[in-house]
Regions:
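Motif I (Walker A/P-loop) of helicase-class P-loop NTPases
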Residues: 1-7
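Phosphate-binding/switch region of NTP-binding enzymes
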Residues: 92-185
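Conserved inter-motif catalytic segment of the P-loop NTP-binding fold
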Residues: 5, 13-101, 105
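Carboxylate/His-rich catalytic cores and anion/metal-binding grooves
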Residues: 10
Length: 185
């Protein structure tokens, strides 16, 4: 809901919004409830990491102000993932290498265009053989460290599991949850 509200506020400031959806899960009614104008929102199916980065590069060339929302990095495959087999070792670190190259190429053009790139990602459990590493770094984010070096602000949102943490509207529709927020640069 936070990303949808950010998109709605960007539209109110006459900023173009490109929404990359890799999960095919965004509901237009949900976006409208958040305040988005669907007529002015550019919805793009995120076919691959390369496709998202190339499309952003192309849109930056239009000279318009942009908010790019990528939902989500974790579930967007690389071209190699799509073309390859199911063996995870065959494409190990491929997404991280593509992101590293893409972010080094796009960081300055994004800044010069006064654009914003909002990347949604997910926390995954750090599966490691080292107990000390598992305790100090219990979670990792997909895509390697490339985004760690590229972001100007990282917002960690972790939810509470209790039903009491749910926020409902006047009709009983769940519109959110209480979360813990950690800001990081």
């Amino acid at each position: 809901f936070l990303a949808a509200q950010i998109a709605a506020n960007a539209q109110k400031m006459d900023i173009n919004v490109a929404y990359f959806d890799s999960e095919s899960a965004i509901d237009p009614a949900f976006l409208e409830r958040a305040g988005c104008d669907l007529e002015r929102l550019m919805y793009i199916q995120a076919e691959s990491v390369e496709f998202v980065l190339e499309t952003i590069e192309e849109l930056l060339g239009t000279g318009h102000k942009w908010l790019f929302v990528w939902d989500s990095l974790a579930l967007t495959p690389s071209n190699g993932d799509v073309a390859g087999d199911f063996n995870p070792l065959s494409s190990m670190a491929e997404k991280a290498r593509i992101l590293s190259k893409g972010m080094s190429k796009l960081t300055v053009p994004i800044a010069n265009a006064e654009a914003t790139f909002l990347v949604l990602n997910q926390l995954k459990t750090n599966i490691t053989r080292s107990p000390s590493e598992a305790m100090t770094t219990p979670y990792v984010t997909p895509g390697g460290k490339a985004m760690h070096y590229a972001y100007s602000l990282r917002i960690w949102l972790t939810g509470r599991k209790a039903k009491a943490s749910f926020i409902n509207d006047e009709n009983g529709f769940r519109i959110g949850s209480e979360v813990k927020v950690k800001l990081e640069k």
